[in-house]
Swiss-Prot record:
Role this protein plays: Globin-coupled heme-based oxygen sensor protein displaying diguanylate cyclase (DGC) activity in response to oxygen availability. Thus, catalyzes the synthesis of cyclic diguanylate (c-di-GMP) via the condensation of 2 GTP molecules. Cyclic-di-GMP is a second messenger which controls cell surface-associated traits in bacteria.
Protein name: Diguanylate cyclase DosC
Lineage per the UniProt record: Bacteria, Pseudomonadati, Pseudomonadota, Gammaproteobacteria, Enterobacterales
Record-level GO cellular component terms: plasma membrane
NCBIfam families (alphabetical): GGDEF
Organism, scientific name: Shigella sonnei (strain Ss046)
Binding annotation for substrate: N341, D350
Example GO molecular function: oxygen binding
Reaction it catalyzes: 2 GTP = 3',3'-c-di-GMP + 2 diphosphate
CDD domains, A to Z: GGDEF, GS_EcDosC-like_GGDEF
Domain of life: Bacteria
Amino acid sequence: MEMYFKRMKDEWTGLVEQADPLIRAKAAEIAVAHAHYLSIEFYRIVRIDPHAEEFLSNEQVERQLKSAMERWIINVLSAQVDDVERLIQIQHTVAEVHARIGIPVEIVEMGFRVLKKILYPVIFSSDYSAAEKLQVYHFSINSIDIAMEVMTRAFTFSDSSASKEDENYRIFSLLENAEEEKERQIASILSWEIDIIYKILLDSDLGSSLPLSQADFGLWFNHKGRHYFSGIAEVGHISRLIQDFDGIFNQTMRNTRNLNNRSLRVKFLLQIRNTVSQIITLLRELFEEVSRHEVGMDVLTKLLNRRFLPTIFKREIAHANRTGTPLSVLIIDVDKFKEINDTWGHNTGDEILRKVSQAFYDNVHSSDYVFRYGGDEFIIVLTEASENETLRTAERIRSRVEKTKLKAANGEDIALSLSIGAAMFNGHPDYERLIQIADEALYIAKRRGRNRVELWKASL
């Protein structure tokens, strides 16, 4: 890639050097005068494509992209020789964002085609001479084409790397502590089954019972299991079993009086038992040949490390956008960790990180993700948790750690606490923005005295 970018730098520099300075000045004049119109028209046309619309539907994104597009047009069409290296880096950065969000390369290519199409009438409606218009158009189109080629090549490289990480994560997820995960999910679906059966047998209210897809097992399967075992036939079988039973469950819940009829009650109980039994059999088959593998895991805490953060965020953001379900993030700092580490030593610091990590696992659902983000900082991705549920989870974790007892080597008690920043997904497709606003909330928590939870709000 380095050699390629050097070659493109030489080509772009040559284009600028060989162009008549007057023509370059007129191209820059067109860009400055019409960038706002071109940006608005560009997004109006691009958003007609339903595939592109899903990436541009967020108001904040659209507002930011329009201003960014204006700057991009002015930068590319006003390029001087000294600007070329910086412009190539800009194309690379934009490509990385596109790959991170998951924008397909064909949409990027369509965007460049639209831009060249709407630029033509702008240039040819100017009061330049016919020869000048033609030269300005050729210089502008060649500049855009070079920028497009650099961006597309960088995008392909970034997207390929992301795809490899997606597959690496899938393999890691399959292998990571599989036996324990299998037993945990079997216990989860059995717990759901027992809860419903007891309520039916004791004539209790079923109103608080959840359909299988919304129970802990169903959430795990939809957010993790389907991805772990993608491409395996049993996944489709489990999906259909969950979907079919949810239909039966919802129909029963609409008229629970039918359960007073013994034959209907027995039929419903048998449907529950058969569904759970089949799912457990299929789960055992899926996990059968899986063994432990720790690549991608933080050795000290046994949490995920940040390697798979992009893969997971990209998938969960796509799921949240597709289903309309909530998504949230917690960024967590161990308060005064450096001071504790310096005072009591690294062994004590390591023990604190292990205890804190256990508190995370004990207070999240199996469909959630917990990462060691670096040092004493952690990220938790909460799937399908409302704002209230997000805050309750954060507060449970904070309270649990605050009550944790830890003694130093000399027997002295060490006080532990966490500062937590929370943020709700607001439709912005770039996960780094979600992390950024959660980090801003974390900063507020620290500024307000530590050992507290703060939720990011636009007014913060």
